[in-house]
């Protein structure tokens, strides 16, 4: 009788263990990532470039002729703190539709994740001069006199200045630099990590990341294009404002 009870107990334990394994199993899937852009809710696409369609927080009427930026270290964080890297780096170009959407090459576990994050630009360790052939071919390099490495963002266009005359601007974000020349110095890091928050990964799911372009001109510092328009790369004060204003430019939308 005792042997029968022991056998029954072992059988139940094994069955419970097998069922637990099945419950804990997770499927894997590819995920589509899409990047969209807007100006305080008004969609910005390639078809809307070059027109004087946008007014920043200071009141400058402006156009956008080019917008491209670099993200790196795109990472999903599990609820237990473990991380999964989705993408090493990617150049996003609003004029190039193929850069705005892609499917992950590696399979990703389905389920809930506590955070999706990426670095805007490159960390200093990755920002190695001339190391990325694809970025070199895009003329994405920063001159050696400014520290070398790569741009974080290029946003170019025109605005109406105080004389109501069209004037160009080049809102180019790089690693903030002082003393351009043979021995430049770096007052502070100006790459930053964007934490988008919790996401749920489903079979053949889609993640949408949106940039509000207007944020680069308003929060926390109101940007007057009459004061800051060109030659911004060697201007560390301007670079630090870009760094601060960009913190709230990205959001996660319509995760499904």
Label the model's feature ranges.
Residues 2-9:
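Sec-dependent signal peptide recognition
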Residues 14-17:
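C-terminal motif of bacterial Sec signal peptides marking the signal peptidase cleavage site
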Residues 20-256:
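A short, solvent-exposed, low-complexity linear motif enriched for acidic/polar residues
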């Amino acid at each position: 009788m005792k042997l029968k009870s022991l056998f029954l107990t072992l059988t139940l334990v094994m069955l419970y263990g097998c069922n637990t394994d099945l419950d804990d199993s997770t499927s894997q899937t590819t995920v589509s990532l899409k990047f969209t852009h807007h100006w305080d809710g008004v969609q910005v696409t390639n078809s809307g470039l070059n027109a004087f369609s946008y007014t920043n927080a200071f009141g400058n009427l402006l156009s956008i002729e080019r917008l491209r930026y670099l993200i790196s270290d795109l990472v999903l964080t599990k609820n237990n703190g473990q991380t999964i890297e989705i993408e090493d780096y990617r150049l996003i170009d609003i004029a190039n539709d193929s850069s705005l959407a892609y499917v992950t090459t590696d399979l990703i576990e389905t389920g809930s994740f506590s955070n999706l994050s990426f670095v805007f630009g490159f960390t200093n360790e990755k920002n190695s001069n001339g190391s990325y052939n694809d970025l070199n071919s895009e003329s994405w390099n920063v001159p050696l006199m400014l520290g070398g490495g790569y741009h974080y963002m290029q946003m170019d266009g025109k605005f109406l200045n105080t004389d109501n005359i069209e004037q160009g601007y080049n809102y180019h974000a790089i690693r903030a630099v002082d003393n351009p020349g043979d021995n430049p110095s770096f007052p502070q890091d100006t790459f930053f990590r964007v934490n988008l928050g919790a996401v749920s990964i489903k079979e053949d799911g889609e993640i949408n990341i949106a940039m509000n372009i207007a944020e680069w001109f308003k929060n926390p510092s109101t940007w007057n294009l009459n004061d800051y328009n060109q030659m911004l790369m060697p201007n560390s004060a301007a670079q630090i404002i870009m760094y601060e204003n960009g913190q709230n430019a990205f959001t996660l939308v319509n995760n499904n």
